[in-house]
Amino acid sequence: MDSKLLLVTQSGSVDDLYSLIQAAPDILQKVDVLPIIHTPLHEASSAGKLDLAMELMILKPSFAKKLNEYGLSPLHLAVENDQVELALELVKVDPSLVRIRGRGGMTPLHLVAKKGDVDLLTDFLLACPESIKDVNVNGETILHITIMNDKYEQLKVLTGWMQKMRDSDDVFIDVLNRRDRGGNTVLHLAAYENNDKVVKQLVKCLSLDRNIQNKSGMTALDVLRARGSHMNKEIEEIIQMSGGKTGGSLSGIQEWYIFLREPVTFKEHCKTRIARYRSRISDGSRNALLVIAALIISATFQTAAQLLDKEKLDKVKKNGMRFSEFQLWGCNTVAFSIAILFSFILLPVGRAYEWWYFIITVPLVFSYFLLMYMMHGLSFFFLIIYEGGLFLVYLLVLYVKWKRCTQMKVRKPKSDLISDNFKNMV
């Protein structure tokens, strides 16, 4: 950096900066052309020259994303030198600065977690929630870094953030179960450190996988027991009570390469086709088909709810239900059942949708058959149950079997080199 520009930066004078620019209009551009350099913004951020730093963000916003010869951005330097106000102002201008990877893949958010500033950590997360996904060159997430530096309060903030945020639940689950270069999750680290407070905090997260194996095939429980006489018995009990197991007890789980080399069965073929249909259908088509299914459910239920007039009802009680009427009610029940199942298949992927759907539709189906019993008596009720209800149960059982097949017990890969599309295979 030019010596005159360095002196102006160290002084923090905005007026002196513009005087220098008037004398040499290209002075900032000469700095900007270099890919790695200690820019005036680096110097201002390190020294806490707030006014000058904000002026440089206007003149040359590209400075904020450059790394100096030590692999640090201006925001890294502001965090390292406890320039909290300046760091927050930089993030206000460009929240993505929180995700800049410096030396070792460390982001400013990682540095904040390492230093232990809870307030700044929260501010960074609020400004850029996606930054929680970032990992360093060792594959360590912010959770790994927090545990390795024994920052318990920061861990409570992070786990609380992941559990209370309403969006991107899958992202936070991946962060919680992410493995570092050695295949160790945050639970492995906590078990190795014999840190009972951290283990208790982690197992409160329902999305935490207690049985992930590292590259040595060890679960968190194995890592804990490997400490021998130094093992904390309380931690062992906590992990076991939360569902943690040893790697040996998981030996029956199928390896990925075995699963992939096996021939595709007809059931897997059908499962794949349905899964692709659910994932590829557009929102517009899904909404239109759900409306059609809802209309069919409404029409068939209304047909079942139509009361016979007194003359026909007496005739039915005297002579019984005619075969044609029985077929009408049977076909109506089948249509009702298929519409219920079809609308279930059309739901977006996610267990929350499925559970709410069951909560709503089970009383509806029950009231449908109860209505027929009240209108036509026990004998007709059992006939319809045999033709329609049994068909519905069969379809639901078939779907449950298919659903279980999609969640086959396959050992998780020993690295995180797996895309979201591949995860959807099983």
Swiss-Prot record:
GO terms for biological process: innate immune response; response to salicylic acid. ANK repeats lie at residues 1-29, 36-65, 70-99, 104-134, 138-167, 182-212. InterPro entries: Ankyrin_rpt, Ankyrin_rpt-contain_sf. Keywords: ANK repeat, Cell membrane, Membrane, Plant defense, Repeat, Transmembrane, Transmembrane helix. This is Ankyrin repeat-containing protein BDA1. Pfam families: Ank, Ank_2. It is a multi-pass membrane protein. The gene is BAD1. It is found in: Cell membrane.
